Amino acid sequence: KMIKLFKTTNILVLLICLIIFTLSFLSFTLLINDGVKTDKISGNVIGSTDVKEVVPNKSEVKVLDDAYFKYVNVSMLDVDFKNLKRQNSDTKGWVKVNGTNVNYPFVKANDNEYYLKHSFDKSSNKKGWVFLDYRNDIDNLSDNTIIYAHGLVNNAMFGSLRNTTKEKWYKNKDNHIIKIATENKTMLFLVFSSYTIEPESYYITDNIESDAERLNFYDILKKRSVYDYGVNLSSKDKILTLSSCYDNTKRMVLHAKLIAVK
């Protein structure tokens, strides 16, 4: 009886191991397939969109900070959104970060969950897409406007944001400008902080009630940075936050303030 029980137990253990292996293999295969689909969708979206970078006429630019004059010859994005809106009516803008692979249209849903598991074409995909916080209006900026995406290991989506914590990236001031375009305007944001942190909700606070609290909020975000960008902030500034997962346990965060609008 003991021998029979031993054999039965071994068979059960073997079956359990086989089931676990099969499920793990299927899960891994699905993730690989999602990655391939994401690369294909990204290629199609970027390839079918007319995205230009144009140095604007200075008289057309509303300068919000004197720091802009250090970047006065920096180009601004000019994007044809017609085709993007036809592909996905949730499209709200385009974001580009120099020195990274971040150069994508971003979307917005009614929550911050949908585009974590859906691609630009709204197909189910665990790699997700780049999306604006549902609380934000990109054409009527909150104190803090937040854009999210997964940090993929192949540097797709926001995976390459990890570059911003490396000396090679932050010592090159040409990388410090984030470009945003919408159907109605194009904007330049100047980076003032980059860091990794344990998951929290503080840095994605969208609006702050008083000037004093807002200035304190900005100061805390600035002090977290791995590098001192030498950027001054006032309580009147509007900031942009790019947020992504980092090594499965942390968040990769990049903050910048609005310095020019066209």
Where in the sequence are the language-model features?
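Solvent-exposed, non-transmembrane regions of membrane-associated and secreted proteins
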Residues: 24-262
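N-terminal Sec-pathway targeting helices
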Residues: 2-19
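Accessible peptide chain termini
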Residues: 1-2, 95
